[in-house]
């Protein structure tokens, strides 16, 4: 019965055009459409399509900041030596995409366009201005340089032109005109046998989200974004790919392990779960069709929790009531959280024990297999926990990855115990007090007072200059 209901609703959705956002552009020939500059100002599309625009704008209501490091100080140790040890908040609404990347301590406090710790690539999932710059400068031109170079250019929050070809005839006629606005995402989909232009509508819906909600790394001297899917999308496939090219995001400052940092692999984990395998898309659950005050259907662009629109999302397929499904999801979330903490405890000990081994005179040859185990354990843990919705998208895969991470961490600690014994160290390696974020940051040598002061100065002096320049150049509304 549930499957028939889903088919009926999907057939219904085919009858009515996808009311995403239609174009303000006049009708164009295919040739002229190719040369139209990407329009990054989202409010441009508001007059003709107020429902979609207002629902997108309502992502600003998702304003709460949740400090993941304060909630779980172990993370500071696992990311010692990496900017994530300074600052890591859980995600919030798309309307804060640009604000949050400016304000995070991870992007530093650059004074000039050539200053700062991070590359231009760190803008790549934040704004339709990225698509505009890639169109204007080419990929190599866009990726060239430091993150601060993009400050006066990337000023509009993630929105219309990130997902829709707003200059196309289809879009002007009210069709969704979905597009992959990032060429590197298009290449990645082709690498896994999913060329976008040959994909069906439902596949395209999730592929558009998969431009950003994926694992990626910065490749080559230009630090260009690349998805590590050449060997496949499972955690072991990506691990093998990274190992083969000898890639690491950073070296943990305690254990000296060459580490991998997972990003937000929702597309990969969704693909591995029951929803992905049955082609229930991101849109089905997070952007359902809803009615406006006049009873007209439109796609809700306030991307959020499916339970907030239960009748339009979960109830399309499931016969259980909302409370029953919430109970199931909560149990899965708790199971993943419990195993996550156990793995983190093992990894924290492993990093400090590895430091003790180095301090005791361990050699590179002695440490290599141990560091490899730590690298693989933390990578598998990170890919599981960096996908914030894994308890819903693929709980079985999440538990499998965490179980594998636990095994690898145990292997590392067993080898460390044996190695330390050869150095005359048989007692347990004590841990410093890492019971709070502040204490953990102090334990790895971070001067947070200075880091925060520099950031505040940057926000007060540099960011206003960026915005003034953007307005003068017509990139921001006055």
Curated annotation (Swiss-Prot):
Molecular function GO labels: calcium ion binding; heme binding; iron ion binding; nitrite reductase (cytochrome, ammonia-forming) activity
Names of the cofactor(s): Ca(2+); heme c
Binding site for heme: 122, 125-126
Entry GO CC: outer membrane-bounded periplasmic space
Organism: Salmonella agona (strain SL483)
Keywords: Calcium, Electron transport, Heme, Iron, Metal-binding, Oxidoreductase, Periplasm, Signal, Transport
Species classification: Bacteria, Pseudomonadati, Pseudomonadota, Gammaproteobacteria, Enterobacterales
Biological processes annotated in GO: anaerobic electron transport chain; nitrate assimilation
NCBIfam families associated with the record: cyto_c552_HCOOH (TIGR03152), PRK11125.1 (NF008339)
Function: Catalyzes the reduction of nitrite to ammonia, consuming six electrons in the process.
Protein name in UniProt: Cytochrome c-552
Membrane spanning residue stretches: none
Binding residues annotated for heme c 3, in chain numbering: 94, 209, 212-213
Ligand binding (substrate): 216, 264
Residues involved in Ca(2+) binding: 215-216, 261, 263
Binding locations of heme c 2: 160, 163-164, 301
